[in-house]
């Protein structure tokens, strides 16, 4: 043990990071030299049941920058608990004693920048409130086995004025409220049950959006997406959102439409699928002055999809490239005929539009 004690702190910390935290903490009994070395561990994983005293204990890690709680229960949080150096926090299948416990826990991280929350339905929390002024990246997964009905009284309230990236996949919530959102935010939103109109009102300043939403249930009362440059949109459930966002996005340059098997959580097995395409009453400004790139992933060749592509080719004055990746349901004959039809449309509008086709 004397030879190990002669090693520099940096190397000892790396060694201690590879063993269970309880074992690492027990090394403090070996000698004075080991008394505080374990507190320098930068990343901590822990599972079990947390009392308020246990949380306060982990606040003694002076250089801890990443903390992951997984499959555990947090009973309470002392007001004096503080993780002053932690920038990355993961809450994975964590149960809490109440909604307030969530709020008290997150208030212990004054410089938190990245938060990952994975919920699995039975965590004793109805309103999961995330109020973190320093937060820059938020990743939320709220899923349950199968396709359960939503809990209308379960959901999220997010108040993060410094947020730069938001990624939500939510199969379960009845609501999601975004308050005090920053002017610039990239967001990836996949929602099964939540009415999306109000949520989108908080994202109108985004430059990049990736959306998979249930069909519109009412009129959209929000403003325009004046800063939106890149849009990814799942069209498996509804083409309504494409119409609306094209009309409201005067600076849009890149459009990606998809029905990817990996990314259609929000509308798989949906009872509300609606794929009817209705042309806008007037040509959206982005088609006339800014849209340059169009991609379609898992294109099936339905009449509605053909109508969309033809409309974009006819009215997209500045579209430089359009790439279409066929779904496996498209026959060989269709894969030959469709490019010929669209290439003719492209030549009518502009010789600068380069069309490409491929099989998934």
UniProtKB/Swiss-Prot annotation:
Species assigned in the record: Arabidopsis thaliana
Record InterPro entries: F-box-like_dom_sf, F-box_AtFBL13-like, F-box_dom, FBD, FBL13/AtMIF1-like, LRR_dom_sf, LRR_FXL15/At3g58940/PEG3-like
Domain F-box: 1-53
Keyword Repeat in record: yes
Residue ranges of every copy of the FBD domain listed in the record: 276-326
Keyword set, alphabetical order: Kelch repeat, Repeat
Kelch repeats: 140-186, 235-285
Name of the protein in question: Putative FBD-associated F-box protein At5g56430
